[in-house]
Amino acid sequence: KLNAPPGLAPEELTLFTRQILRQKYVDADIGITGVNFLLADIGAVAVTENEGNARLCTSFPKTHIAITGIEKILPSVNDLALFWPLLATHGSGQHITVYNTIFSGARKENEIDGPEDMYVILLDNGRTNILADVTARESMFCIRCGACLNVCPVFKNIGGHTYKATYGGPIGSVITPYLSGLKSYKHLSYASSLCGACTQVCPVHINLHELLLYNRNKSVKAHCGSRSEKIGWLLWKKACLSRAMMNMTNGRIKNFMIKLLFRKSWGDNRSLPDFAPKTFNELWKATEQ
């Protein structure tokens, strides 16, 4: 697609791509960046990065558009002394990221660099729904470091694309039902072992596993589940409470039934886990004999 010569080494491919992208930055009329923090006292946006692409986006184009959620406001620029290292340490294990920039507007008449125009777009997209909920409000403390994703056993196994949402991992499972609808995304709150590892590593002390339970409770009270789902879980409960029913069939039949019932809801991104040929109870009885 880019007409790269065949047989290039990884380093050569990097240089080849860099030349193409650098020209695109130079020719662009508009540069769009995200925002890590909004600074209320000086009316500025703070961006932290390791590659320097955000600086390129704001240096060459005539117009800089910064897009951010409304929850990223810090009271003072002095708070960056805490939050920039906090984000770097929990996000990538660094003391501080390589490039840290504060943008306070378009360039003045006597300045020679920076964009001629700057626009900041504040996104709500359901965030006020979260802020209105006293219990769920603490999820808006998130600084997007990704620490909860790195320790989550579910995220490690299914990956980010399986969530089919803007935000994945534990924090995504907490906030997505508010941002995109509880009925459509209630299942994300069940994609958790409730081990609490996400809560332990969160730098801003969000009780993520408790908020996942809270979302589950809300979905039940809102009657978001279908009738077939309720019947299915009732049968599952009866089977799990009966040792005779648990030992009734072997692993092969259980695998067939689970794939038949849950293949569609499980999705195509991951294969269903297999049952062991014998249950632990059966193996224990065989050992006792």
Regions found by a protein language model. Name each.
Residues 75-78, 91-96, 150-153, 157, ...:
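Acidic/polar loop patches that form or flank catalytic/metal-binding clefts of enzymes
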Residues 68, 144, 203-204:
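Small/polar loops that bind or transfer phosphate-bearing groups
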Residues 253-289:
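Short linear elements at protein peripheries
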Residues 110-139, 154-262:
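Ferredoxin-type iron-sulfur electron-transfer modules in oxidoreductases and energy-metabolism complexes
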Residues 1-134:
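The feature marks the mature, well-folded catalytic cores of soluble enzymes
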Residues 41, 150, 200:
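Short alpha-helical basic/polar micro-motif
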Residues 9-10, 76, 95, 101, ...:
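Secondary-structure junction/capping motif
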Residues 142, 146-149:
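Phosphate-binding glycine-rich loops and their immediate beta-loop-alpha structural context
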